[in-house]
Design a protein with these regions (language model features):
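N-acyltransferase acceptor-side catalytic subdomain
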Residues: 1-161
């Protein structure tokens, strides 16, 4: 037994700060993992959230997944990480941490009577979960200056920016 434990992120300043520090140190994270998106989703869209963490025996954060509960007549009840964006899946220091976050997400889905869970990652997970490639993302590396960026676009596109 490794001593890892899953819990729900609270609202204290210390917990939120630890979450954001973990996100900023992770190469797997996107800006959408930052805790500020929790407030945006709850306050602007009215969707409840459940941000899960994995902590070691010493209490240090070693994994997380931001989950949002969505319910609609058309799509049913489900948890997604994260809605409205293509990134926001699990981040963990170990495969065991990922497994614990998956188990925590499944438990939350049961509590909320959710029909499925969507975890949005850039790369496929090493899991038995069903995977889909219906989402498409496009990225553009940013050059050193705004002027260099504009030079890379055709003139018609530049006039629309």
């Amino acid at each position: 037994m490794s001593g890892l434990m899953v819990s729900t992120l609270g609202r204290s300043e210390a917990e939120v700060l630890a979450w954001d520090q973990y996100v900023l140190k992770s190469f797997e994270a996107s800006g959408y993992h930052l805790s500020g998106w929790r407030r945006v989703i709850e306050e602007a869209f009215g969707h409840p959230t459940c941000y899960l963490t994995v902590r070691g025996e010493n209490g240090a954060l070693c994994g997380l997944v931001p989950l949002v509960f969505l319910a609609s007549r058309g799509f049913g009840r489900f948890l997604v990480s994260l809605p409205f964006v293509n990134y926001g899946g699990m981040i963990a220091d170990s495969a065991e941490g990922c497994r614990l976050l998956e188990a925590g997400a499944i438990e939350q889905a049961k509590v909320l009577d959710a029909q499925h869970i969507e975890l949005r990652h850039e790369a496929p997970l090493a899991t038995s979960w069903v995977s889909t490639e219906r989402k498409v993302s496009m990225r553009l590396p940013l050059p050193p200056s705004y002027e260099d960026l504009l030079k890379g676009f055709p003139s018609k596109l530049r006039s629309q920016v």
